[in-house]
UniProtKB/Swiss-Prot annotation:
It comes from Bradyrhizobium sp. (strain BTAi1 / ATCC BAA-1182). The keyword Cell division does not apply. Belongs to the enolase family. Keywords: Cytoplasm, Glycolysis, Lyase, Magnesium, Metal-binding, Secreted. It comes from the Bacteria. Pfam families: Enolase_C, Enolase_N. GO terms for molecular function: magnesium ion binding; phosphopyruvate hydratase activity. One of its GO terms (biological process) is glycolytic process. This is Enolase. Its main location: cytoplasm. InterPro entries: Enolase (IPR000941), Enolase-like_C_sf (IPR036849), Enolase-like_N (IPR029017), Enolase_C (IPR020810), Enolase_CS (IPR020809), Enolase_N (IPR020811). Binds a second Mg(2+) ion via substrate during catalysis. Mg(2+) binds at D242, E285, D312.
Length: 427
């Protein structure tokens, strides 16, 4: 009854109005699993390839009809009549069907859509929530949300070089209360920015994009909003950064255009260490460029014992790159983005490798999202304890938070909010 009888790919729009892939997998028993694929703005050079049509007369070249065609023809033929419950075999067939190291022939967007839709169809067929189907009976940890409330970098049209300034409500007793805390700070920040004469338009991920001159200025506004909302920064709420340093790394220097300043590798490490000393920052993502391996080692040696250092562009959810980082002492955490690697099996393998090495894992969205809330279930399924899925605005972001609220309610007394235990520096 779990045999695949149909696979239907289609072109839909993401949160930026660009085309993306959606897939339905239909089973013999009538179960239908649906998955939509996200897309990034600041993408790592080593990510699996998102296949775009390149026809400038249609969606400015960003159409995904080639990927959809591969789903409806080649992938359907390869998986038709297979049992959907063998996720590992399905994903292996998809990888072999593509035949390239970076999934560039069929496209990681086509492969991921099918991989996730298969898992969702299987869960529906077994009448189980996705987090339970993937994670088993031990899946019960609700993640601490990393809420991106100030946007900069390529996610916003302002002078701030860092891409994201986030709050983490680690002191809340439950996920629902953490969400309330974040919402109250978000709305307080809006009022503070307005009062200071800044615009309160939001960026791709729902955070505000004020015209501020530096990271310090952004952090000061966030700190003020935390206090005025009635919370204690450093106790109830911690701060996190996504520097996205690859985006401003040029000719061996970190070029801060907003500040009209350049920093060497060592100066960049010391600058981040200084921010950690002056603000309650417990997590920094991509503090160094993706290929600045010496910089990553220097930063990890300098502050890795007191701050979570998350590799996104550095690792791109790839076990080979993660293994190299573990061997050489680079970073101490990995950002998990399903579309960076392209299949559910490979995603779960990266999480498992991180855990075994003592690294933390952070489940993450992309800046181009959809209403699909799969990553909320995967965060609980893997018990990773942290999720990064944007601000408290835009339905493509709140869809994930709302799904986590449902999961917490469903788990009831079994639910455990990760809180401070999610971060080794606080545990």
């Amino acid at each position: 009854m779990t045999a695949i009888v149909d696979i239907i790919g289609r072109e839909i729009l993401d949160s930026r109005g660009n085309p993306t892939v959606e897939v339905d997998v239909v089973l013999e028993d009538g179960s239908v699993g649906r998955a939509a694929v996200p897309s990034g703005a600041s993408t790592g050079a080593h990510e699996a390839v998102e296949l775009r049509d390149g026809d400038k007369h249609r969606y400015l070249g960003k159409g995904v009809l080639k990927a959809v065609e591969a789903i409806n023809d080649e992938i359907y033929e390869a998986l038709s009549d297979m049992s959907v419950q063998d996720q590992v075999q399905i994903d292996q067939i998809l990888i072999e069907l593509d035949g390239t190291p970076n999934k560039s022939r069929i496209g990681a967007n086509a492969i991921l859509g099918v991989s996730l839709a298969c898992a969702k169809a299987a869960a529906i067929s077994y009448d189980m929530p996705l987090y339970r189907y993937v994670g088993g009976t031990s899946a019960r940890t609700l993640p601490v949300p990393m809420m991106n409330i100030v946007n900069g970098g390529v996610h916003a049209d302002n002078p701030i070089d860092f891409q994201e300034f986030m709050i983490m409500p680690v002191g809340a007793p439950s996920f629902a209360e953490a969400l309330r805390c974040g919402s109250e700070i978000f709305h307080t920040l809006k009022g503070e920015l307005k009062k200071a004469g800044h615009n309160t338009n939001v960026g791709d991920e729902g955070g505000f994009a004020p015209n501020l001159p530096s990271a310090d200025a952004a952090l000061d506004f966030v700190m003020s909003a935390i206090g005025k909302a009635g919370y204690n920064a450093g106790e109830d709420v911690m701060l996190a950064l996504d520097c996205a340093a690859t985006e401003f790394f040029r000719d061996g220097k970190y070029v801060y255009e907003g500040e009209n300043k350049s920093r060497s590798r060592s100066e960049q490490a010391r600058y981040l260490a200084d921010l950690v000393a002056r603000y309650p920052i417990v997590s920094i993502e991509d503090g160094m460029s993706e290929d600045d391996m010496d910089g990553w080692k220097e930063l990890t040696d300098l502050i890795g014992s007191k701050c979570q250092l998350v590799g996104d562009d550095l690792f791109v959810t790839n076990v080979n790159r993660l293994a190299d980082g573990i061997r050489n002492g680079r970073a101490n955490s990995i950002l998990i983005k399903v579309n960076q690697i392209g299949t559910l099996t490979e995603t779960l393998a990266a999480v498992e490798m991180a855990y075994k090495a003592g690294y933390t894992a952070v489940m993450s969205h992309r800046s181009g999202e959809t209403e699909d809330s799969t990553i909320a279930d995967l965060a609980v399924a893997t018990n990773c304890g942290q999720i990064k899925t944007g601000s408290l605005a835009r339905a493509d972001r709140t869809a994930k938070y709302n799904q986590l609220l449902r999961i917490e309610q469903e788990l009831d007394a079994q639910a455990r909010y990760a809180g401070r235990s999610a971060l080794k520096a606080l545990a």
